[in-house]
Amino acid sequence: MHSMLLTPDKDPMGAAIIDYLAHGKASKLRVFSSMFDEDEIPVNQLFRTFQEMPSLEQKALQLCTGKILDVGAGSGCHALALQEMGKDVCAIDISPLSVEVMKQRGVNDPRLINLFDETFSETFDTIL
């Protein structure tokens, strides 16, 4: 299977994330998909702290154990929260822009890779 990574010209979410990091402002991302209803995501929500997350989301992070894989990590907010808890987390994304933001924000192990890349063969205890 050939793995797919995004190019900057086809990465509106990555562009919004890196723009928000650089300028501290962005409006909403409109998400269109044949797999679910149209949605709007306020970009600042992608930069929330653990304390700003809903209680269900906080609980999900607290229940993560062992070696954790954060798939589609975006800006790295979950990876950063897990790191603050002292947990071992690898954050992956197919967006080079998002991976750059994760590096700038201090995510310890951000990687530009597709989950379905046949060369990605590590094992994890928790997948988020």
Task: Write out the residue ranges for each language-model feature.
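Conserved SAM-binding strand-loop segment of SAM-dependent methyltransferases
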Residues: 106-117
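Short alpha-helix immediately C-terminal to the canonical SAM-binding loop
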Residues: 99-100
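Conserved alpha-helix/loop element of class I SAM-dependent methyltransferases that forms part
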Residues: 47-67
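A short acidic, Gly/Pro-enriched loop at the edge of an enzyme's catalytic core
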Residues: 118-127
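Conserved SAM/SAH-binding beta-strand->alpha-helix loop
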Residues: 95-96
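N-terminal auxiliary segments of SAM/dcSAM-dependent transferases
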Residues: 1-32
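Conserved SAM/SAH-binding loop
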Residues: 75
